[in-house]
Amino acid sequence: MTNIRKSHPLIKIVNSSLVDLPAPSNISSWWNFGSLLGVCLGIQILTGLFLAMHYTADTATAFNSVTHICRDVNYGWILRYLHANGASMFFICLYLHVGRGLYYGSYTLTETWNIGILLLFAVMATAFMGYVLPWGQMSFWGATVITNLLSAIPYVGTDLVEWIWGGFSVDKATLTRFFAFHFLLPFIIAAMVMVHLLFLHETGSNNPTGIPSDMDAIPFHPYYTIKDALGFLVMIMMLLTLVLFSPDLLGDPDNYTPANPLNTPPHIKPEWYFLFAYAILRSIPNKLGGVLALVLSILVLAIVPLLHTSKQRSMTFRPISQCLFWLLVANLLTLTWIGGQPVEHPYIIIGQLASILYFMIILVLMPLISIMENHLLKW
């Protein structure tokens, strides 16, 4: 009699994904972030579901309903801060996951990579709409500024913005629809994750050497289930430390002031995880140009597989490319810092230089250095 694990129509799908999946024997902790993102998504959906039971998506009561959750609902404060800081953990894991893909050449699995880019866009859209829901000052003005960017689209821009707003300004209709989409999108993301994994399991995982590991694979369980479990423990400990000791560390104090359309905050800025893109947007004086640069700052990832000129897949044995990669990381940290600064000298010029360098590294320097390394290795 065959094992139910291998014969049951549903269980065998789980078995082939989580138990008997052949995995490379040498994947490092950088491969933990995929499962950590799954945990983050689970935490966000669960905490979000319970928050939605007490939240009201109405301009008159939204801010007070969030206060009510924190003060009056049993353990409402921990739900709210787990959800807010869980988003930060989500993005930390996301950026490390994408960075891992860039460093080790995982982008050569093009279907998995492209679905990943779509997932990144979907998570960013969800996070943006979630930030609007507490209806504080930064929620309102962030929504106004970011949705207004669509007005830069020629001919249809203004109509498009008013269509999204549901009126002539960010108001009740906007808040209600943002809540609806913020609730819906995580489930669409969960479905996209399934497709992401489906494509990944078609080819199998990459590994730090970038060399096919078919001849040296080990079963996912127990080796990587226990390794993932340790990752979960570390991440949840970090999240709980943040939530229980300094829950407002990454938030904006302006969002503790109820939304007021008549009073603009001195510095409108998004959450920290969008600051690098916001800095790129602000570094271009033209509105349409800024919007295009903003979209391209993420969309540029889609052409990375086409720009892979090295004869090696991974950067493990390419020290010059490694230097360039870490320059890109430093550059992104610089952009994140600039995004949170006021628009004045010297921040403007630093932001412009960092923005140019960001696209230069990905589009020009990486492919050229890879060709040079091929020659140095006489390949």
Swiss-Prot record:
Cofactor binding, note field: Binds 2 heme b groups non-covalently.
Sites where the protein binds heme b b562: H83, H182
Subunit comment: The cytochrome bc1 complex contains 11 subunits: 3 respiratory subunits (MT-CYB, CYC1 and UQCRFS1), 2 core proteins (UQCRC1 and UQCRC2) and 6 low-molecular weight proteins (UQCRH/QCR6, UQCRB/QCR7, UQCRQ/QCR8, UQCR10/QCR9, UQCR11/QCR10 and a cleavage product of UQCRFS1). This cytochrome bc1 complex then forms a dimer.
Transmembrane segments: 33-53, 77-98, 113-133, 178-198, 226-246, 288-308, 320-340, 347-367
Subcellular location: Mitochondrion inner membrane
Residues bound to heme b b566: H97, H196
Keywords: Electron transport, Heme, Iron, Membrane, Metal-binding, Mitochondrion, Mitochondrion inner membrane, Respiratory chain, Transmembrane, Transmembrane helix, Transport, Ubiquinone
Pfam name, any one: Cytochrome_B
A GO BP entry: mitochondrial electron transport, ubiquinol to cytochrome c
Main localization of the protein described in the UniProt heading: mitochondrion
Organism: Miniopterus fuliginosus
Free-text function comment from the UniProt entry: Component of the ubiquinol-cytochrome c reductase complex (complex III or cytochrome b-c1 complex) that is part of the mitochondrial respiratory chain. The b-c1 complex mediates electron transfer from ubiquinol to cytochrome c. Contributes to the generation of a proton gradient across the mitochondrial membrane that is then used for ATP synthesis.
Protein name: Cytochrome b
Membrane topology: Multi-pass membrane protein
UniProt entry tagged with the keyword Metal-binding: yes
Extra information: Heme 1 (or BL or b562) is low-potential and absorbs at about 562 nm, and heme 2 (or BH or b566) is high-potential and absorbs at about 566 nm.
Gene Ontology annotations for the cellular component aspect, listed alphabetically: mitochondrial inner membrane; respiratory chain complex III
